[in-house]
Amino acid sequence: MNTHVSDITQLTIDNWGVTAQTGILTDVLLGKPDHFRWVPLNSISAVNQANEEQMGYRFDKQKAMRQHRQMVEAYEANGVRVHYVEADEGLPSSVFTRDSSFMTPWGAVITSIQTPPRRRDYAVASEFYRNAGIPIWKWVTAGHFEGGDFVIVKPRVALMGWSGDRSTKDGAEQVEGWLREKGWDTFVVPIPPQFVHMDAVVVMLEENLALVCEDALPSYAIDWFDKQGIERIVVPYADCVKLGGNVVSLGGKRVLSMSHNVNVNRTLKERGFEVTAIDYEMFALGGGGVHCSCHELRRLVPG
């Protein structure tokens, strides 16, 4: 059953917080797709939309609504409670909740999105946290930093990316400073703008295991993963730019993916993962995958 804001207010703050992006996912924040439509958000969506006529792409609102509902049902079938930011007709891309905030052990961080159609997504994100009784720990004020560029690699170790087109170096460094004040180890690395966010390049699957597009990272970043003891399942460049690595770890060797990720899904199954793959074409063509479309509010601590 879906959990709405009126239900969330009955929960205590002790129920919230994320110390790792692995472990059993219990609560997830999604956007409502009521006003979703295609707008040029990034290089992926801009190219897709520029090729609509030649490639036969066509936005289908009812299909998008069905696909989003399928995602909700997949979460619920895996025991995840679903929460929502409210739909707003002026914010057609707020369905991609990964970017407007991210959760920490101390509360939420409200981000600063650079893309003009999304600059006010912070309004519905911050409203959700206020209504839910979840503290807002920080607001990004230096440059821009978006939640898709924040990866907790392991407890107290965070990876942050910036492309310049979306997150900026000064925004990433502001977040880095907050975490270092809390005693965390941090690593900031630039990524090519065609990948948009770090979560198109690196997604944690299980403790010390990640999907990684090594072609998108400098060699010193690969060395950093080695030093952290992170095993990597490599996603080829061609799959990565189609959001092939943009999956959601549900914990317990379970993954939510998209059906067009044929190669990645096959590899994950060969590695013993239970893969729930949904058709998410309307949103992927619009610039975001299933990982872009969610934000974890609570995970059980690994181990």
Question: PLM features: what roles do these ranges have?
Answer:
Residues 1-303:
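The feature marks the mature, well-folded catalytic cores of soluble enzymes
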